[in-house]
A protein has these predicted regions:
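Acidic donor-binding segment of Leloir-type glycosyltransferases
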Residues: 27-68, 276-303
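Conserved core of the sugar-phosphate nucleotidyltransferase
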Residues: 319, 323, 334, 343-432
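Short, well-formed alpha-helical segments that are part of the catalytic scaffolds
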Residues: 18-32, 252-272
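Conserved donor NDP-sugar-binding/catalytic core segment of glycosyltransferases
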Residues: 104-134, 330, 356-365
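Glycine-rich, basic loop-to-helix element that forms the pyrophosphate-binding segment
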Residues: 69-85, 314-324
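Conserved nucleotide-sugar donor-binding catalytic segment
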Residues: 143-225
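Short aromatic/hydrophobic "clamp" motif used to bind/position activated sugar donors
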Residues: 90, 335
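N-proximal low-complexity "stem/linker" segments adjacent to membrane-targeting elements
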Residues: 1-29, 231-251
Length: 467
């Protein structure tokens, strides 16, 4: 027998912070794997519950290494694990989740068979606090070329990665404290091949205290990650913003919320965008032109007279946008159509839409919210669910994406050729629930007015309609 023990093939690490109630299940799911060539690092991030006692009981197991540390947060801990790991492959298991018995065997087998492959991730089950399966996450098949747009990241945990590739890209970015999987995905997919397994190989726990429930923080962090990588790529994101206005006495352009005019607020918000170089207000209503007179000193806010025949309710905007693109679109890379109906959209949403389009190389992009509802059509004999969505539980149904937020952007060269705003490969940017609130009725006005009043009084400038 050799005096030198070979390094294990896989380094599994469990990160734990105050998850004593789930921790044993997670650790045991590693120790009972069908594949045995692994080491297990258990990293406790300064827990104050019974975690240390539970972890200590595994101290005599030769496969287990234990690291206790003061609270450092997830991304710092991920990098500590990478430095401590000796395996050819590395995989994280969160302390509130657990593996299927063949998880390590399946994922390492895929990587062993494909030396150029850098990352593999499986489908997974959703479970509740009592280990009841409440749904399944099913991904499109990377191996069968179902995936050509890499804008849906792998889960941050239970994804197996080739350790030397992970080191080459510098590990995890410690300036972010959540969305580690997304940040890594952006970096990793730029240089290495990734694939998935169609089998569910871990159990992901949905409960009130886990991070994924804080949607607004997640979306803001994703936007910051996108911005960071776009800054590195130095792409030309110059954008011409178009606000289409039909006009008429009841038009939103003439209305106010808490004393702030809706059109003025929208223009001022766009003027603060990193990428918007010109703002074109397009309307058949000549009063709108007078209304924007205060901006005349700014060379970048201009009026475009829109033919009345192109401003009817059922007419699409393509002819108008083509005219604007020809007249005002010199030297810009993108066209963005921004509607007035969504007053809680902020400049960060606009910038993130442009960044997302550039980062994933799509031709156009639209702002959306995922929607898991069941929709019906009337077929003359009663209601029928669309896409057989009644056959699935809520968590199994693949989300439909609902266009909300009033942001559509397209690369100018793509639009000039196709004369369609949503053209070529269409990307999406998810906006938060507040930003998706639109003005379509008196009740909407009341709700948005209340939100902005509350935010003005608590001085939360993020959701005040920008003046």
């Amino acid at each position: 027998e050799s005096l030198f023990k070979m390094s294990p093939l896989i380094s599994v690490y469990i990160t734990n912070y105050n998850y004593a109630r789930f921790l044993k299940k997670a650790i045991d799911s590693v120790l009972s794997q069908s594949f045995h060539d692994y080491e297990l690092l258990i990293i406790d991030d300064g827990s104050t519950d019974d975690s240390k006692k539970i972890i200590g009981s595994y101290g005599s197991n030769p496969k287990v290494k234990i690291i206790y540390q003061h609270n450092k947060g997830l991304n710092v801990t991920n990098n500590i694990a990478i430095r401590a790991a000796v395996g050819k492959y590395i995989i994280r298991l969160d302390a509130d989740d657990y593996f299927a018995a063949n998880a390590l065997e399946q994922m390492s087998g895929k990587l062993e068979a494909n030396p150029e492959l850098g990352m593999v991730f499986p489908n997974y089950y959703y479970i509740d606090e009592k280990d009841q399966v409440i749904g399944e996450e099913i991904r499109h098949d990377f191996d069968n070329n179902e995936v050509s747009l890499l804008d849906q990241p792998a889960h941050g945990a239970c994804t197996m990665i080739r350790t030397d590739f992970l080191n080459k890209i510098g590990g995890y970015d410690e300036s972010f404290n959540c969305q580690d999987g997304y940040e890594l995905w952006i970096k990793f997919t730029q240089g290495y091949k990734v694939t998935n397994l169609k089998e569910p190989l871990f159990y992901y726990r949905k409960h009130g205290s886990n991070l994924t429930s804080n949607e607004e923080m997640i979306l803001q962090t994703r936007a910051k990650i996108n911005q960071k990588y776009i800054n590195k790529l130095q792409t030309n994101n110059s954008t011409l913003a178009i606000i289409p206005i039909r006009g008429g006495d009841k038009d939103l352009a003439f209305q106010t919320i808490n004393g702030v005019n809706i059109l003025t607020a929208k223009i001022n918000m766009l003027l603060r965008s990193t990428y918007v170089e010109k703002i074109i207000i397009s309307s058949p209503d000549s009063r709108i032109e007078k209304y924007i007179t205060p901006y005349k000193t700014k060379k970048n806010v201009l009026f475009h007279f829109r033919n009345e025949t192109e401003a009817r309710i059922n007419d699409n905007l393509n002819a108008t946008i083509f005219d604007i693109s020809n007249k005002f679109g010199n030297n810009v890379a993108n066209l963005a159509i921004i509607t007035l109906e969504y007053p809680l959209i902020r400049r960060e949403h606009i910038d993130d839409a442009i960044n997302t389009m550039a980062l994933f190389g799509t031709d156009s992009i639209v702002s959306v919210r995922p929607d898991n509802a069941i929709f019906y059509q009337h077929h003359g004999d009663g209601l029928h669910p669309i896409l057989n969505r009644d056959k699935f539980t809520k968590l199994e149904r693949e989300a439909l994406f609902k266009q909300l937020g009033g942001i559509t952007a397209v690369r100018k060269v793509v639009f000039d050729e196709s004369k369609q705003t949503l053209s070529g490969r269409v990307g999406h940017v998810v906006i938060d629930q507040k930003a998706a609130l639109g003005l379509f009725s008196n009740i909407d006005f009341e709700i948005i007015s209340d939100i902005t009043k509350k935010n003005q009084s608590s001085n939360k400038t993020n959701d005040v309609i920008e003046q």
